Regions:
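Short, solvent-exposed loop/turn segments at secondary-structure junctions
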Residues: 13-15, 42-44, 87-89
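Short, surface-exposed beta-edge/turn micro-motifs
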Residues: 3-6, 31-35, 41, 76-80
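Short, well-structured hydrophobic secondary-structure segments
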Residues: 34-54
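Compositionally biased, intrinsically disordered low-complexity regions
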Residues: 12-14, 36, 73, 144
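ADP-ribose/NAD+-binding catalytic cleft of ART/PARP-like enzymes
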Residues: 1-32, 49-50
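Conserved NAD+-utilizing ADP-ribose enzyme module
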Residues: 47-153
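Short His-Asn-centered micro-motif
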Residues: 8-11, 38-39, 84-85
Length: 153
């Protein structure tokens, strides 16, 4: 499969050099220490917006819209889209890529969370159930084995 022209990493911080680190979510696909990025600009922005406040969220597999389970994005916050060269990245899973090296962004864009409302919505129970179907390690909010679902890529 051909690599995309650019990859994207969303964050609440403007980061000059992205350093490999271990994600905080419970997905086994995110067990490696690295710099996580996506080929989908709207996913990087949507996840950064969701993380602008304490939320539990997941990406809808079909629409790529971010489904919020708990909490709500901070509409007053600003997030940053780090545009990356894919040369040091390998595909981890579908539209997700991973680099084991430090990555310097080609460009960094600033976005107001209030301008990104089209990238997320409140999740229905049906959507959450579908999402959790093949993810035994994940737990819905309220299940105290794992407090909540957090993304950090």
């Amino acid at each position: 499969m051909k690599k995309p022209k650019y990859l994207y990493h969303g964050s609440g911080k403007k980061i000059k050099v992205l350093e490999p680190r271990k994600p905080t979510d419970s997905d086994p696909m995110h067990s490696k220490k690295g710099v996580y990025a996506t080929s989908l600009k709207k996913v990087a922005l949507g996840m950064a917006a969701a993380r602008s406040a304490k939320t539990s969220a997941f990406k809808n597999r079909k629409t790529h819209v971010i489904n919020i389970i708990e909490g709500w994005p901070d509409l007053k916050a600003t997030v940053y889209l780090h545009i990356l060269d894919p040369k040091d990245f390998k595909q981890n899973h579908k539209d997700e890529y991973l680099s084991m090296k430090k990555v310097k962004p080609i460009k960094i864009e600033e976005h107001k969370v209030s301008d990104l409302k089209h990238l997320w919505r409140k999740s229905s129970k049906k959507e959450l159930k579908e999402f959790l179907k093949d993810r035994e390690a994940w737990r819905a909010p309220g299940d105290r084995k794992i407090k909540a679902i957090f993304f950090d890529f």
